Amino acid sequence: MTVSPPVAEKLAELRDAFDRTFAVARSSHLVDQTEDLLFVRVAGDPYALKVRQISGIVSSRKTIAVPSRVPELLGVAAVRGGFVSVYSLAALLGYAPASDPVRMLVMCGSKEPVALALGDFEGYFRVSSRQIHTGEPTEPARGRVKQAVRVADTTRAVVDIPNLMELIERRVGAHPI
């Protein structure tokens, strides 16, 4: 197979550009730090989840309700050969219990993994860290978000997953199932 001259030139140009990226020393002022985010909607409001703070995503599983004094607990589900507790992300963020169907589970934690149930997934985005700003969260998620990101004319609160995990641990410790 022969490659036409314009295509061969473009390939050579791309190859040279690729090689140059390894020849330039990395420094913090030359390399823009990025953050990978999942864009979701909770009760119709736009939110973002940091990919580095989650351990996986699975499609919705049958969730078996269990008696609990923890209102955010939806039940347990079988994921990756084991059982995980499934919590409503909307309820953890302070929203009233929603009747929206659960479409996906976001896995969080490593030693005691839990799943956060959500309905609307809007996509995966890589943004510059400079696009993420610290600010005062708005109701109802006050205390559960500490940052916001603006992409394509939409400002999204960035959910603080470690904070949610601590909240779950406190609630479960105070009210065992």
PLM features per residue range, with description:
Residues 1-177:
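An acidic, low-aromatic, low-complexity terminal/linker signal
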